[in-house]
Amino acid sequence: MCIRDSAICAMYMGEMEVTTTHNPEGTGENFSAGSLMGQISFSRMLTDRFSFGISSKIIRENIYNSKATGFAIDLGTLYITQIQGLTMGMSISNYGTKMKMEGRDLLLQTEVDPSLESDPININANFATDPFELPLIFRFGLSYTKLISKDLKCLFAIDALHPNDNTESINAGTEISFKDFLFIRSGYANLYQRDRVSGLSAGCGIKLKISSSTYFIDYTYVDMGPLGNPKKLTLSTSF
């Protein structure tokens, strides 16, 4: 059996006031920042217990008038154990190109040679930013599903993360589903991570089946400590 999915995820941080070294109290202008990701996924059952999946995605980040774009893939496997309800999996996420910020905010004017005695000649220049790696992550996780009643079931999950840009950490969470339509979720991220910021998260979602397609709408609240409490709205579909 083959499964194909597509998804679009967006994060918007709202407007913030522009400050500079000359105007630390603000210039009167505002700026915003955000991220956008489009993804197409393919998975296949290799046996009745073992499956494999791959996702390709385009990632875009922007702040004020500058942006960066990159391409990455995710690879993962899933194994249904002989213990009823217990599943294990592993994955590699964000294996792809480097990203680099570009845009008119990085344009400036500079003198050709300040040591020359002639009148200064300013030319347009571009501030060259360094390319940066996507956060490559290796995950290993376990999940256990408990059927409470015909319409109600509970999922417990835990996974360990090994990233290329931070210390190792653990995520844990639970999901309660009603009639495979309404979902309530809660979890805790980045346990044991050094200098962690995010922590408790909670949210809900619904699953809609229309014709031969399935649509998912999910809302999430995340505690980001000193960065505030962002909210995420995710829309995805499978066909």
Which role does the model predict for each range below?
Residues 1:
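Sequence context surrounding c-type heme c attachment/ligation sites in exported
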Residues 4-239:
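Subset of outer-membrane beta-barrel
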